[in-house]
Amino acid sequence: MKLTPGKLAGLKKVSNDRGVIAAAAMDQRGSLQKALAKEKGSAVSDAMMEEFKSLVTEVLTPHASAILLDPEWGLPASKRRSKNAGLLLAYEKTGYDKTGPGRLPDLLDNWSVRRLKEAGADCIKILLYYTPFDGKEINDKKHAWVERLGDECRANDIPFFLEFVGYEEGVDEKGFDFAKKKPEVVIESMREFTKDRYGVDVMKVEVPVNMKFVEGAKSYAGQKAYTKKEAMDLFRKAASVATKPFIYLSAGVSNAEFSESLELAAEAGVKFNGVLCGRATWKEGIPVYAKQGAEAFRKWLQSEGVKNINNVNDRLKAASSWHSIYEVEPAMVGA
């Protein structure tokens, strides 16, 4: 598979020299607003959202290959990123449609791929809530939606990152029952969206297990859904269905738990191509910003935030370059 010139240029901008994506995510909107308001005890202004995102971007991007932001509150932050870091912009509205079943997605009303590119995006990111267990009527809508996005990114010659997050209505997605189902949700989602018809250049995926239920893991909470060997087999099985590069998302777990999942992927010999890691890096700083303000948060980021991102970066030594997947010659990488 070869990339078009614009897609190749965009992917190189968000990757390190090795062709690994070591990106930070700061496109959280509704969930971040709620978390800040809860800690602060009052409403959160637009200026606070912009300031929080700008501080994370300024302090963490010297240690990242890229930052993922949203065009609603993240554009001022995008101007404060380090020169080494590329920019991914989110195109979807925060959350999902709660008026009917299926967690259907929606795009930002005043944005298009063309406009995101004009705002400085090197790559476009879309989040989709998806489960292969939903009915055909729901998933057919989602498949058509992703096809349209793939075509819009192709028309603008910009890389398309698709993030899919599994779910099951009426079930605790952090609980044991979903942990048993999660591998199949992740594997079948990857099998679907790796198809060329969707035009996805990089899949942003969940790890296929819940580490809290892996027997013998440091994160193990006492109830077994899988042995360590079974968990490693599931990592390998998920990787085996991918024909496109894939990177892991942190899904709001702790830095220690996310780091351990990357170690397990490495031990399983999985050729993952990087991470897009958000809350595992900065979420513990939310109360610091809400209660003590910008300077205290900056100091927290400079110590704890940087430590967290370096912790993840250390685990990326085991990640594989996407160059070989897209037949990029070593001589072309610097071009």
List each language-model region with its residue ranges.
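Alpha/beta catalytic barrel-like cores
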Residues: M1-K136, G199, Q223-T227, K244-P245, ...
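Active-site glycine- and acidic-residue-rich loops that bind
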Residues: K2, D134-H143, G175-I187, S250-E260
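Conserved, mostly hydrophobic/aromatic
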Residues: A24, E163, M203, G278
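Glycine-rich anion-binding loop/nest that anchors nucleotide
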Residues: V202-V207, P245-S254, G274-L276
